[in-house]
Every structure is written in structure tokens, then in C-alpha cells.
């Protein structure tokens, strides 16, 4: 297995794409620290990984908590004594046209999609540098992987998502910058921009509570899905969580050891 013995941290892995990512990495031998806002979904992912013969541990909590990054990284080090793969997947949308968008809506997207990954990566910097220096002194070249998640909205914009598009564009800038900073430590930092994937975010409109307990509308109009599948997506359908996870997995394999600072779209042919 290509990831045998690696330690992977995945945020937002209790359901949907995040769960598919965690299960894919575990199926290839990685030991996964599974994060979700709630203990239930995180535990369900861990149980599914265990049933499939993999190894994982749950770490519930909101990625927007100021100390989340430190605690998340500490859990990986305490449980598995390693840190090889980080996938910053957690997120959601809170759409509105700009004239109706509140400061709270705009800031919420920056908090979860930009500030949270920044804090996780900042917390990971000390152990990553420490491991890399020890490996260099021993004459070993060991690559680590960071995969940040952006969106086609961050690449080309999307009406009603000025907050989400701004945040996901920032993720790309963070990815490219960190690829330059961490190259000396043999860390590949790449980004996957998802198109329209069949998850609760593309289900018919409904309301859910976010990390702060606020009610937010999630999902899309059914007419949009029909238009996407018949007119906008060249491959003619939405993607599955498993197909989205495969894009992330590619950046976690040894085959990506000389690829860094790149953005790949997993969107069925949608390009900008």
C-alpha cells in the first residue's frame, strides 16, 4: 500500500467528501486522525475505517476554535508519533448577494476556509521542521504532503458567493506560498479545487446549524443541478465523494513527490 504507516490528518471528515478522503487514505495504509464538528459523524467514519481493516482515531471539534490547530496536531503526535499528510477539507457555504451579505457571513467563510487551515499548518510547522532536519542529517529524503481544498468558485467566481469565492481564492494563495516556504523541508503543498460534487451541499435547499449554532441555508435549487448536468459539466453529471477523494489521494502518493504549489480541478471538465 502506498501510504503504509503514514499519519494523516483530515478535517471535516465525518461525512461526504471528507469521509471519502479519510477512507481512501486509510485503505492505502495511512493511520488517520478524523475530525468533525460532532463526535457522532467522526466516530462513524472511524468505525467504517476499522470495519474495512484500517486504523483511525476521532477528534471532534470546531476548526474555528482558536486552539484547534494546536490540539489537532498534538493528538496526531500523541497517538501515532508522526505527521505525514494534512488535508484541510472542513468547510461550508453561506450564500447571499453582496448587497444583502452581512459582515458575519463574510467573516464566517474566512474563518473556516482560511484562518482554520492557517492555524493548523502553523501548529504543524514545528514538528514538520524537526522531523525534516533529523531526516536530512540521517541522509534520508522523506516527503510530506499538505492538500488544501479550494473550489471552482475560488477560481472563477460564482454569483451569491463573494464570501466563499474570496476565501477559496485565498486558499490558493496560501498553498502557493507555503509550497515555497516548505520546499526545503520536503513538503509538497498542493490544492484541489472541487467542482460540483454530490453531497449535502448540492442537495435541495435546507437549513443546518454551523459551528456557532447559527442556522445557515445549504444546498442548491434543483434547477441548477439540471442545468449543470445538461449544459455546464462536460462529463454530464455531478461527481461523487469518492471521485473527489481520488483527486486528493493523488497528491498524497509518492508519485507527487516532485509536484508542489499546484491547483488541480476535480470538476468533470469545468474549467476557468
Residue ranges and their predicted role:
Residues 121, 167, 175:
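Active-site helix of classical SDR
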Residues 156, 247-249, 260-272:
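Short C-terminal tail/terminal secondary-structure segment
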Residues 126, 180-181, 257:
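Alpha-helical segment proximal to the catalytic Tyr-Lys
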Residues 82, 183, 188, 259-261:
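Short, small/polar-rich loop/turn modules that mediate ligand/substrate recognition or access, typified
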Residues 3-33:
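Canonical Rossmann dinucleotide-binding motif of NAD(H)/NADP(H)-dependent dehydrogenases/reductases
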Residues 97-98, 102-110, 229:
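Substrate-binding pocket helix/loop in short-chain dehydrogenase/reductase
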Residues 151:
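Residue(s) in the substrate-gating loop at a strand-loop-helix junction
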